[in-house]
Curated annotation (Swiss-Prot):
Coiled-coil zones: none
Keyword terms of this UniProt record: Cytoplasm, Peroxisome, Protein transport, Repeat, Transport, WD repeat
The name this protein goes by in its record: Peroxisomal targeting signal 2 receptor
Provenance organism: Dictyostelium discoideum (Social amoeba)
GO term, biological process aspect, one: peroxisome organization
Similarity section: Belongs to the WD repeat peroxin-7 family.
Entry superkingdom: Eukaryota
Any one GO molecular function term: peroxisome matrix targeting signal-2 binding
Renumbered ranges of WD repeats: 56-96, 102-142, 145-185, 188-228, 232-272, 277-316
C-alpha cells in the first residue's frame, strides 16, 4: 500500500479521468472546523505517491472533482461557500482561475457531469443545489427542496439530465435538471444520509449511506423499499463509490475507520475485503477507472492511501 502524508485532514480523493496515475485530494486544517484548506494534485508512482501541485485556500476544502472536458482543471468546494477551479499547469501556490461564490454556507459536494462534460453540480449546507458551467459567471440553475444540509449531489453517469441528492433530512431525491421540482422523494433512512452514488451500469439504481451504519440500494422506479441493505460498518457510512468495472461491486468508507469492498451478488457474504489502514475517520474514497481494482482513500489521520485489490473476478 502506498501512502502520502497530507499534513492537513483529508476530505476527498478523485482519480483523473484522463491520466491513470493522477489523483486529486482536498484537505482541511483542524478537521475542517476552522483554518485553511489545501488542494493536492498527486501522482501515484511505482513505489510511492508524490505531490505534483498544491494550492492553498483560506478556508477548509470538503470535496473535489475533475473536469470532464479539460484534463488540467479540477474543482474544489469550500467551507466558505465557494467553488474554485484550479489549473494544474499553473505553479503550486497559484490562485484559482475561477471562483464561484453564490452558496451561503459550506459546500460539501461537487460533481462533474460525465455525459455533457460542460457542467458541474454542487450541494451545500444552505439547503440548495446549483448547476454551473465553468465558463459562466453565475450558476445556471438552483434547486431548493431539502429541509436540512445537503451532503451529496451526484450526476447520473448515463443520463445527461438526471441527478440524485441526499440530505440530513433523511431523504434521497431524484431530479431532472430541466424541471424545477424533484421527480421523486424517497425517505431512504431513519437518520441523516451522508452519501450517495449511481450504479455505473444501471441508471435506475442509486446507493445511499447513512448515519444509521447501513448502505441501501434503490431502484428509483420502485421507491417503497430498498432492493438490498448492506450491513457491516459500526459507525456512520461517510462515502460510497460504485465500481467502474463491475455492476455488482461498490466500496464504502466510514467513521469506524474502515474501507469495505462489497459484491452484492454474493448475497450470503457480500463483504469481499475490509481494510483498516487508517487510524481516524475515513471520508474520501475512489476507484481508478483505468486500473481495475485500484483504489484510493483519505482520512482525518492525514494519510492518502492507494492500493490494488486485483481484478474483481478473483474474489468470486
Amino acid at each position: 500500500m502506498k501512502r502520502f502524508h497530507s499534513h492537513f485532514n483529508g476530505y476527498s480523493v478523485e482519480f483523473s479521468p484522463f491520466e491513470e496515475q493522477r489523483l486529486a485530494c482536498v484537505t482541511s486544517q483542524h478537521f475542517g472546523i476552522i483554518g485553511n484548506g489545501r488542494q493536492y494534485i498527486l501522482d501515484v508512482l511505482d513505489r510511492d505517491i508524490g505531490a505534483f501541485k498544491t494550492f492553498d485556500t483560506r478556508d477548509g476544502l470538503y470535496d473535489c472533482t475533475w473536469s470532464e472536458e479539460n484534463e488540467c482543471h479540477v474543482a474544489s468546494s469550500s467551507g466558505d461557500g465557494s467553488i474554485k477551479i484550479w489549473d494544474t499547469q499553473a505553479p503550486s501556490g497559484g490562485r484559482p482561475i475561477k471562483s464561484f461564490e453564490e452558496h451561503t454556507k459550506e459546500v460539501y459536494s461537487v460533481d462533474w457531469n460525465l455525459v455533457t462534460k460542460d457542467t458541474f453540480i454542487t450541494g451545500s449546507w444552505d439547503q440548495s443545489i446549483k448547476i454551473w458551467n465553468p465558463r459562466m459567471d453565475r450558476s445556471l440553475k438552483t434547486f431548493r427542496e431539502h429541509r436540512y444540509c445537503i451532503y451529496s449531489a451526484i450526476w447520473s453517469p448515463r443520463n445527461a439530465h438526471l441527478f440524485a441528492s441526499v440530505s440530513g433530512d433523511r431523504t434521497l431525491k431524484i431530479w431532472d435538471s430541466r424541471d424545477n421540482r424533484s421527480l421523486n422523494t424517497i425517505k431512504a433512512h431513519d437518520h441523516e444520509i451522508l452519501t450517495c452514488d449511481w450504479n455505473k451500469y444501471n441508471d435506475k439504481e442509486v446507493v445511499t449511506g447513512s448515519v444509521d451504519k447501513t448502505i441501501r440500494i434503490w431502484d428509483i422506479r420502485y421507491p417503497d423499499r430498498p432492493t438490498t441493505i448492506l450491513r457491516g460498518h459500526t459507525y456512520a457510512v461517510r462515502r460510497i463509490k460504485c465500481s467502474p468495472h463491475s455492476e455488482s461491486m461498490l466500496a464504502s468508507c466510514s467513521y469506524d475507520m474502515s474501507v469495505i469492498v462489497w459484491d452484492r451478488a454474493r448475497e450470503q457474504d457480500p463483504i469481499i475485503a475490509r481494510m483498516d489502514h487508517h487510524t481516524e475517520f475515513v471520508v474520501g474514497l475512489d476507484w481508478n477507472m483505468f486500473i481495475d481494482g485500484q483504489m484510493a482513500s483519505c482520512s482525518w489521520d492525514e494519510q492518502v492511501c492507494v492500493w490494488n485489490l486485483g481484478r474483481p473476478g478473483q474474489f468470486r
